[in-house]
Every structure is written in structure tokens, then in C-alpha cells.
Curated annotation (Swiss-Prot):
It is found in: Plastid, Chloroplast. Belongs to the RuBisCO small chain family. One of its GO terms (biological process) is photorespiration. It comes from Triticum aestivum. This is Ribulose bisphosphate carboxylase small subunit, chloroplastic 3. Keywords: Calvin cycle, Carbon dioxide fixation, Chloroplast, Photorespiration, Photosynthesis, Plastid. One of its GO terms (cellular component) is chloroplast. Heterohexadecamer of 8 large and 8 small subunits.
Amino acid sequence: AYLPPLSTEALLKQVDYLIRSKWVPCLEFSKVGFIFREHNASPGYYDGRYWTMWKLPMFGCTDATQVINEVEEVKKEYPDAYVRIIGFDNMRQVQCVSFIAFKPPGCEESGKA
């Protein structure tokens, strides 16, 4: 990553923007924080593109601290996983924003955990 990790205050601002934009916050986690190929040799197929969703999308969420509290829960349950926050536009059915909220201790910037 080219940017330093976001502070809790910066995460709150990003999530506030996401909520003000009427996007639905979602959390995802993965033990591998980069795109990789494992199960298919065909061009353009990447196993690491999809992460595991934490619970359900947070429909109706109006408070950024609710999202940050969920990030803390993911960190406790999966301390060696990357956590990202997604903003999903449920009207257009597209992902509008995605950013890393947590990197596990000891991860390398080179793309390997």
C-alpha cells in the first residue's frame, strides 16, 4: 500500500462519507490481502478477488461507530486477517468504495502475509 494505515478517526470520516452517500456498509475479511491465482490457469481468473463477508450488509446503518465496532469484532475473531470496508449502492447494485480498515500484525507490504 502507498498510504499509511488509517487511524480510527480517519476510518470514522470515511464511513461517515459512505453513509452520507447512501451506500450500505459491508465488512469483508481475508487471510490473504492480495489477488492471487490458485485454482485456475485461465487468463483473468483470480481467486483472491473475493473475500469472506462478515455477517450481513449493514442496511439502515446511520452511525459510523457501529461499523467501527464491527471492525473490532472481526479483528478479535480473526486477528490474522485483513479487514476491508465496502460501500455498496443497493439501487445500482454496485460496489462504490472499498478500503482496508485493518492489516494483521507482521504483514509485509510486498503483498504477502
